Amino acid sequence: MKAARFAMHSARSLSSVGLVPREVELFSRYSPSPLSMKQLLDFGSDNACERTSFSFLRQELPVRLANILKEIDVLPDRLTNTSSVQLVKSWYIQSLMELVEFHEKSPEDQKNLSDFVDTLIKVRNRHHNVVPTMAQGILEYKDTCTVDPVTNQSLQYFLDRFYMNRISTRMLMNQHILIFSDSQTGNPSHIGSIDPKCDVVAVIQDAFESSKMLCDQYYLTSPELKLTQVNGKFPGQPIHIVYVPSHLHHMLFELFKNAMRATVERQESWPSLTPVEVIVVLGKEDLTIKISDRGGGVPLRITDRLFSYMYSTAPTPVMDNSRNAPLAGFGYGLPISRLYAKYFQGDLNLYSLSGYGTDAIIYLKALSSESVEKLPVFNKSAFKHYQMSSEADDWCIPSREPRNLSKEKMAM
């Protein structure tokens, strides 16, 4: 316990004065090693070897943490000096230092393996509030200084990479904990958090019902679901893929919430609500899910903002010291959902018809061998993204009143 308190104090002290341990410099020189869904399954198969997973993670997790710590250091000083970002940085440094302690420990010793699982659980719990805490840091920064378009673009670039890094480290830790922990709490048909035969339609229906319950509570009404499935790969059979059900549920739940809200608010005076229509199609390479509503859509000028962090129609939340910090109001629903889709080489896009409705489309890889982690790496190319300077726009900006060329000719 004393060692843990000392590590936490040291991490905060180093972070507060802008210093990082030499271990961060060391591990940031390595690039992360992306895993495919198939490789993750192999780690958790019947022949899974805890020692192999231990040996991989004690190297890989510090590499991923160190890479993103280096990226935090190139952010504007006023941002990195906020109390929230300092706190996040101290968590990452402490976690890295705790994981590095296992580098010299033998994987043949069962106690080391058990201690490693305990450490992963501790790290995962420590990072529980990373998303809202970093979001609070961005808000603190924006409250103290004006953010120009170039800086805003850099923040968007950083947050995409920071949260993708978090998704990936959490995925690796969860896999090891669920498979090798003494307390088996996962679904017995899953390998860790991965379902080898994920029933896509079942996840869609579950996410819809969860959203419907919220909609009923708030609006006292909700639209129905109209679902169509097309299995172009194996006609007539149910649609199954290798995937992480919790990731898919997260994406669908967010999209259904938006679709239901738009539908109810747009059609409150209509005799009945139009259904939210979903079509799910399995092809040879991709699984595609399209969610369509008639909620009125949004103008083109707003569409791009929907995937921008900090854009939200909900009131800005207030952080407290509880472990249940809110995310609603930070504007993170859609951008985080898109990251979940992109994590295994998929995507999430919105197509809106202003005055009619919106189509939201999720693309996922149909083959587990092609579902490979999409990971940020801090290198010269990434560094350049943060060194961009604000330059004059090279496109004409229309004036409110067109120039009167006839008067200019007379003046000449």
Swiss-Prot record:
Key word Kinase present in the record? yes
- List the GO terms this entry assigns under cellular component, sorted alphabetically: mitochondrial matrix
Positions bound to ATP: 254-261, 293, 312-313, 329-334
**Which Pfam families does its entry note?**
BCDHK_Adom3, HATPase_c
Tell me where it resides: Mitochondrion matrix
Q: Which domain of life is it from?
A: Eukaryota
Q: Which GO terms describe its molecular function?
A: ATP binding; pyruvate dehydrogenase (acetyl-transferring) kinase activity
Which UniProt key words apply to this protein?
ATP-binding, Hibernation, Kinase, Mitochondrion, Nucleotide-binding, Transferase, Transit peptide
Q: Name one GO biological process term.
A: regulation of glucose metabolic process
EC number(s) reported in the record: 2.7.11.2
Q: Which SMART domains match?
A: HATPase_c
- According to its UniProt record, in which tissues is this protein expressed? Detected in skeletal muscle and heart.
What's the catalysed reaction?
Answer: L-seryl-[pyruvate dehydrogenase E1 alpha subunit] + ATP = O-phospho-L-seryl-[pyruvate dehydrogenase E1 alpha subunit] + ADP + H(+)
Q: Where is the Histidine kinase domain?
A: 138-368
Site (Interaction with the other subunit in the homodimer) found at Y157, R161, W395
Induction remarks = Up-regulated during hibernation.
UniProt function note: Kinase that plays a key role in regulation of glucose and fatty acid metabolism and homeostasis via phosphorylation of the pyruvate dehydrogenase subunits PDHA1 and PDHA2. This inhibits pyruvate dehydrogenase activity, and thereby regulates metabolite flux through the tricarboxylic acid cycle, down-regulates aerobic respiration and inhibits the formation of acetyl-coenzyme A from pyruvate. Inhibition of pyruvate dehydrogenase decreases glucose utilization and increases fat metabolism in response to prolonged fasting and starvation.
Q: How does it assemble?
A: Homodimer. Interacts with the pyruvate dehydrogenase complex subunit DLAT, and is part of the multimeric pyruvate dehydrogenase complex that contains multiple copies of pyruvate dehydrogenase (E1), dihydrolipoamide acetyltransferase (DLAT, E2) and lipoamide dehydrogenase (DLD, E3).
State the similarity comment: Belongs to the PDK/BCKDK protein kinase family.
Protein name in the entry: [Pyruvate dehydrogenase (acetyl-transferring)] kinase isozyme 4, mitochondrial
- From which source organism is this entry? Ictidomys tridecemlineatus (Thirteen-lined ground squirrel)
